[in-house]
């Protein structure tokens, strides 16, 4: 039969398609073409080449349709519901287009328009009716979608927004994600800033603390809401300087050094006024000597002036006394304020108001005075605003006392001079031999130019010299000697007082027996001596023999260069040394001793406090009876002792005897080198040890004890917490009553115990007694070697065992229990899940209530049970009771030895049987099922497909509802039946009932014994016959002589004639075929692009990729994804774009 074809434009597929001569194209774009045999061969060759490429690369996974025969290639065109024709190679296409075996179940004569290309088992089908393109490949590697061109990747456009977790996303979704992310970040930033501002406000509003500031007023308070009355500024190194102190106004205000300097200035002013009165008196006396006639008047005037001077001096002294009284009163007030303070961490100094102009100790508005202690000495200067301490005031009081004594001596000397003057008024027998000289008194001699000698036996031999007093002598130029037996022999020297001597140039000696022999020296006070250059001795029997030295106080001695001794019996013999306090001694160079009996003998040493001793170089002793004998040592506190080099002892009775040691706290002891003890009775005796806390002890080398009564006796050990004990080497105990006795052990938690070497116990009552064991959680126990217990009341007693979870128990060697109430008692067993149990050796139970009791058994899933040796149960309520049995799926059961059940409710009861699929049953020995509701009851039988049944021994049923009931029978295809012994049925609905019969094809029937029915609907009812059709549906057989009758086969000649006719008909289809070729090229490129996408790798769950391909200049891009649903099930899908066509495909495979 001849047909004429034409090509028309399909609006749905947007392609040119082949159609009947009677078809009309919408829009009138149809065109008639004449196809040539060469054109068809070209299309077929290209199709075969493209299909071969797909086979080599792999496309979408296999489908369930029947595969075509191998080594065949061809094309099948179907339109208007009927098959056009087929050009192919090989036996599969030898007799025309096949109606079955196409991808997606395509069947000839059942679809309106479709084109199929095949090469062996790899196919491409263009379904015009559905507007879809389908792919299938026999390969297993078609899992890569690659899109590329000569310069790189290609653009995939028109992509819809992804919905499912495995969908691709487009640019719109990505932009939306970026926008939402930016919004989230902005929101986070805003909320963070708000939180920080809130935190700042909360911190500023704190009412109790060390130093707080009100958030609203800015006022600073110190412990405003705490009841303590004492502020202690002392640090680890002693008192601190309080700077920025405003001048006190009220009786309870602190005073600064500026106020103290002002007081000193007013005192000096009083002294200056007294000196001015004395000078006025001397001038008057000189006038009396010049004119005897007016001597009486001048004397009276001088006496009056002297009286005035004395009165002024008295007034100044009274004013000074008032100032001292006022100062004493202020000091009494300060002392009263400071006396009321109690040491309190919660009480600190705060500003009274936001202006920060005043600070009231005890808080704003408090009228009860408080004591301010441990105030470092403030800087004394006119511009200083520093606070001063009691020591500085005491020194000022001592200096004032000395100046007062000096003034008393000067007034006494003045009284003597007046008495001598009165005697001179009666008789003047002195000799004045110098130019402009004056001599008054018996045997008075003034031989120097402008000299004055006033007094019995007084001598003024130096130019501009003045000698006033009995036996007074002024021999130095510009010298002055005032007082009985006073001597001023140095240039510009001044001797003021009975038997006073000033022999050094610019020297001054004031006081009875005072002696200033050094250049620029000053000696003030009875028996005071200043022999050093620029030295100053101030006080009764004081001595300043060192250059630039100063001795202030009764019996004070400053013999070192630049030394200072202040206080009764104080001694400063070291260069640049300072002794401040009664009987204080500073003998070391640059040393300082402050306090009664304080002693600083070491170089650069400092001793502060009664009976304090600093004998080490650069040492510091601060506190009553404190001792710092080690070089660079520091002792702070009553009876504190720092004897080790670079040691520090802080606190009453504290002792730091080790090199670089530190003891901080009452009765604390640090005897180990580099050791630190902090706290009452704390003891650090080990080298590099640290003890912190009351009664803490660190005796091990590099040990640390932190907490009340904590003990760290092991080398490199650490104990933290009340009664914590770390006795093992490198051990650590943290928590109340924790104990770490094993080497390298760690106990962390109240009452925790780590006694095994390298053990770790973390949690209340946790216990790790095994070597290398770890116990974590309350009441956890790890007693086995290398064991681990993690969870409340967990137990790991087996060697190398692990128990994780509340009440978890791992008692078997190398066992692991994970989950609440889990138990692993078998050797090498593993229990994972709540109440899971693994009692068999090498067993594994995973899931709530899972149980693995058999040796080498595995149970996975809720309530799963593996009781047989080497058995495996995987799935909720699954059961594997047979030896070596495997059950996979919910309620799956493998009860036979070596049996395997896979799928929900699957059952494999036969020995070595396999049941795969939901409700599948394999009851026969060595039987196999694969498919939902499939059944294999015969021994050695196999059933594949939904509801497939293999009842006969050695039978095989393949396909949905396939039945193989005969012994050794085979049924393949949906609804196929092989009931005869050794019978075979292939094809949907095929039926082989005869013994040894074969039925091949849809609906084929072979009922005769040893009969064969080939082809759809074929019937072989007679024994030992072969049928290729049925009555009324006969088929031709080729390669025979020319047929004559209606049922005869035709020969090659007849076939060639038929092919020639077909070619003549196809000549007019060339344009349509060319269009088809172009579409095929694009389709091949699209299909190839799908194959370029890599498959999901073993061990991974999901893979998403893109691919590209080019075939004969036609470019395609593809996007695909592969997902591994389970270990046996894998799904693949993809979409490809070429030109204006889209290709998509999906596949699924189940493997076992």
Curated annotation (Swiss-Prot):
InterPro entries on file: Adhesin_Head_dom, Coiled_stalk_dom, ESPR, Pilin-like, Serralysin-like_metalloprot_C, YadA_C
Region spans: Translocator domain: 1100-1152
Q: Where is region (Outer membrane translocation of the passenger domain) located? A: 1062-1099
Q: Where is the signal peptide?
A: 1-71
Query: What are the UniProt keywords, alphabetically?
Result: Cell adhesion, Cell outer membrane, Membrane, Protein transport, Signal, Transmembrane, Transmembrane beta strand, Transport, Virulence
UniProt region (Disordered), positions on chain: 420-886, 900-949
Q: Where found in the cell?
A: Cell surface; Cell outer membrane
Q: A Pfam family this protein belongs to? A: YadA_anchor
Gene Ontology CC terms, in alphabetical order: cell outer membrane; cell surface
**What triggers its expression?**
Expressed in vivo during the course of aerosol infection. Expressed at very low levels under routine laboratory growth conditions.
Role description: Involved in virulence. Mediates adherence to human respiratory epithelial cells.
User: What is its quaternary makeup?
Assistant: Homotrimer.
Its protein name is Autotransporter adhesin BpaC
């Amino acid at each position: 039969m001849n047909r004429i074809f034409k090509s028309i434009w399909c609006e749905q597929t947007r392609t040119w398609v082949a159609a009947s001569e009677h078809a009309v194209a919408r829009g009138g774009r149809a065109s008639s073409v004449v196809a040539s045999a060469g054109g068809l061969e070209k299309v077929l060759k290209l199709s075969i080449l493209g299909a071969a490429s797909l086979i080599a690369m792999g496309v979408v996974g296999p489908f369930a349709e029947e595969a075509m025969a191998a080594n065949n290639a061809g094309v099948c065109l179907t339109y208007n519901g009927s098959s056009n024709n087929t050009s192919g190679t090989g036996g599969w296409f030898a007799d025309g287009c096949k109606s079955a075996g196409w991808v997606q179940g395509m069947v000839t004569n059942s679809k309106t328009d479709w084109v199929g290309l095949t090469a062996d088992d790899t196919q491409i089908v263009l379904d015009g009716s559905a507007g879809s393109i389908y792919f299938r490949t026999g390969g297993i590697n078609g899992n890569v979608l690659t899109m590329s061109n000569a310069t790189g990747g290609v653009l995939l456009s028109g992509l819809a927004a992804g919905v499912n977790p495995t969908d691709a996303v487009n640019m719109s979704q990505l932009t939306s994600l970026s926008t939402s992310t930016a919004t989230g970040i902005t929101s986070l930033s805003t909320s963070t800033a708000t939180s920080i501002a809130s935190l700042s406000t909360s911190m500023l509003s704190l009412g109790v603390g060390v130093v707080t500031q009100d958030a609203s007023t800015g006022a600073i308070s110190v412990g405003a809401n705490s009841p303590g009355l004492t502020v202690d500024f002392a640090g680890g190194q002693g008192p601190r300087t309080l700077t920025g102190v405003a001048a006190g106004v009220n009786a309870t205000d602190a005073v600064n050094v500026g106020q103290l300097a002002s007081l000193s200035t007013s005192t000096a002013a009083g002294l200056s006024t007294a000196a001015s009165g004395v000078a006025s008196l001397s001038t008057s006396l000189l006038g009396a000597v010049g004119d005897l006639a007016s001597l009486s008047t001048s004397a009276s005037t001088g006496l009056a002036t002297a009286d005035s001077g004395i009165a002024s001096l008295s007034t100044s002294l009274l004013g000074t006394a008032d100032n001292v009284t006022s100062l004493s009163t202020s000091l009494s007030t300060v002392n009263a304020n400071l006396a009321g303070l109690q040491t309190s961490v919660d009480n600190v100094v705060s500003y009274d108001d936001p202006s920060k102009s005043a600070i009231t100790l005890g808080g704003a508005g408090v009228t009860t005075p408080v004591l301010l202690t441990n105030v470092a000495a403030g800087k004394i200067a006119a511009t200083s605003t520093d606070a001063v301490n009691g020591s500085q005031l005491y020194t000022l009081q001592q200096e004032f006392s000395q100046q007062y004594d000096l003034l008393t001596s000067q007034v006494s000397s003045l009284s003597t001079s007046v008495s001598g003057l009165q005697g001179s008024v009666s008789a003047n027998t002195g000799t004045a031999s110098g130019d402009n000289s004056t001599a008054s008194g018996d045997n008075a001699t003034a031989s120097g130019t402008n000299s004055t000698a006033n007094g019995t036996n007084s001598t003024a031999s130096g130019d501009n010299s003045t000698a006033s007093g009995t036996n007074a002598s002024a021999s130095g130029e510009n010298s002055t000697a005032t007082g009985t037996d006073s001597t001023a022999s140095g240039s510009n020297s001044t001797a003021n007082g009975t038997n006073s001597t000033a022999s050094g140039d610019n020297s001054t000696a004031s006081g009875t027996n005072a002696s200033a022999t050094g250049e620029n020296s000053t000696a003030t006070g009875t028996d005071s001596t200043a022999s050093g250059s620029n030295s100053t001795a101030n006080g009764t029997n004081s001595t300043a023999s060192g250059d630039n030295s100063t001795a202030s106080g009764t019996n004070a001695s400053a013999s070192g260069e630049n030394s200072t001794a202040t206080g009764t019996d104080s001694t400063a013999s070291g260069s640049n040394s300072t002794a401040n306090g009664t009987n204080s001694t500073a003998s070391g160079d640059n040393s300082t001793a402050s306090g009664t009996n304080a002693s600083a003998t070491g170089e650069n040493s400092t001793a502060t406090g009664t009976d304090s001793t600093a004998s080490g170089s650069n040492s510091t002793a601060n506190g009553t009876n404190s001792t710092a004998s080690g070089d660079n040592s520091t002792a702070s506190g009553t009876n504190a002792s720092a004897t080790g080099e670079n040691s520090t002892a802080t606190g009453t009775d504290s002792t730091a005897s080790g090199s670089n040691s530190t003891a901080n706290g009452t009765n604390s002891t640090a005897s180990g080198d580099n050791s630190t003890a902090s706290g009452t009775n704390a003891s650090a005796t080990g080298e590099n040890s640290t003890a912190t806390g009351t009664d803490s002890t660190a005796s091990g080398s590099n040990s640390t004890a932190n907490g009340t009564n904590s003990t760290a006796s092991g080398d490199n050990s650490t104990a933290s917490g009340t009664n914590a004990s770390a006795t093992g080497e490198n051990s650590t105990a943290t928590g109340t009553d924790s104990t770490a006795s094993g080497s390298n052990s760690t106990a962390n938690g109240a009452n925790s115990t780590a006694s095994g070497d390298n053990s770790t116990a973390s949690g209340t009552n946790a216990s790790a007694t095994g070597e290398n064991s770890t116990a974590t959680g309350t009441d956890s126990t790890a007693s086995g070697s290398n064991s681990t217990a993690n969870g409340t009341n967990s137990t790991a007693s087996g060697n190398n065992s692990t128990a994780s979870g509340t009440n978890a128990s791992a008692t078997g060697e190398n066992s692991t229990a994970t989950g609440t109430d889990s138990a692993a008692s078998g050797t090498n067993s593993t229990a994972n899940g709540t109440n899971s149990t693994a009692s068999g050796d090498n067993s594994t139970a995973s899931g709530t209530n899972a149980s693995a009791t058999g040796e080498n058994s595995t149970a996975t899933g809720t309530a799963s049970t593996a009781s047989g040796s080497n058995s495996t149960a995987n799935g909720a309520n699954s059961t594997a009771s047979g030896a070596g049995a495997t059950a996979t799926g919910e309620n799956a059961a493998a009860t036979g030895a070596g049996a395997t059940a896979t799928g929900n409710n699957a059952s494999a009861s036969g020995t070595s049987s396999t049941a795969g699929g939901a409700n599948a049953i394999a009851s026969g020995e060595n039987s196999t099922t694969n498919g939902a509701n499939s059944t294999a009851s015969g021994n050695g039988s196999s059933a594949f497909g939904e509801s497939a049944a293999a009842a006969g021994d050695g039978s095989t049923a393949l396909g949905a509802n396939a039945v193989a009931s005969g012994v050794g029978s085979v049924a393949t295809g949906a609804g196929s039946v092989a009931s005869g012994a050794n019978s075979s049925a292939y094809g949907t609905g095929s039926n082989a009932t005869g013994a040894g019969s074969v039925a091949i094809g849809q609906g084929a029937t072979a009922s005769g014994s040893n009969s064969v029915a080939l082809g759809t609907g074929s019937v072989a009812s007679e024994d030992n016959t072969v049928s290729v059709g049925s009555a009324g549906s006969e088929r031709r057989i080729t390669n025979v002589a020319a047929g004559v009758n209606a049922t005869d086969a035709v020969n090659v000649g007849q076939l060639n004639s038929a092919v020639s006719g077909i070619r003549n008909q196809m000549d007019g289809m060339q344009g349509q075929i060319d269009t088809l070729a172009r579409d095929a090229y694009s389709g091949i490129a699209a299909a190839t692009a799908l194959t370029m996408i890599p498959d999901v790798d073993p061990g991974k769950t999901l893979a998403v990729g893109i691919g590209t391909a080019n075939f004969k200049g036609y470019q395609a891009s593809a996007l695909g994804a592969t997902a591994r649903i389970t270990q046996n099930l894998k799904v693949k899908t993809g979409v490809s774009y070429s030109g204006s066509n889209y290709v998509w495909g999906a596949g699924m495979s189940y493997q076992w």
